[in-house]
């Protein structure tokens, strides 16, 4: 049976921590930032954890499951 291939676009967007959580970046921060509040843009810079509903799908894309 061949090896699982990693989805390269998912590998650039997600990272798995040692405890198994999946870290992602926020959306809506690349353009049209002039109309967004400063504290909103600051919050969008932080990383976020992928929800449990999407966790298995992302792990399959990363070739971890």
Swiss-Prot record:
An annotated GO cellular component: cytosolic large ribosomal subunit
A Gene Ontology biological process term: translation
Gene source species: Thermotoga neapolitana (strain ATCC 49049 / DSM 4359 / NBRC 107923 / NS-E)
PANTHER family in the cross-refs: 54S RIBOSOMAL PROTEIN BL35M, LARGE RIBOSOMAL SUBUNIT PROTEIN BL35M
Single Gene Ontology MF annotation: structural constituent of ribosome
Coiled-coil regions listed: none
The keyword Secreted is annotated on this UniProt entry: no
Record gene name: rpmI
NCBIfam families noted in UniProt: rpmI_bact
Matches recorded under InterPro entries: Ribosomal_bL35, Ribosomal_bL35-like, Ribosomal_bL35_CS, Ribosomal_bL35_sf
Highest taxon in the source lineage: Bacteria
UniProt protein name: Large ribosomal subunit protein bL35
Record keywords, A-Z: Ribonucleoprotein, Ribosomal protein
Family: Belongs to the bacterial ribosomal protein bL35 family.
Gene3D superfamilies: 4.10.410.60
């Amino acid at each position: 049976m061949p090896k699982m291939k990693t989805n390269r676009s998912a590998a650039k967007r997600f990272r798995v921590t040692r405890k198994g959580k999946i870290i992602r970046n926020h959306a809506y921060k690349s353009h049209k930032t002039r109309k967004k509040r400063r504290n909103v843009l600051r919050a969008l810079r932080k990383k976020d954890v992928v929800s449990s509903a999407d966790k298995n799908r992302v792990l399959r894309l990363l070739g971890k499951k």
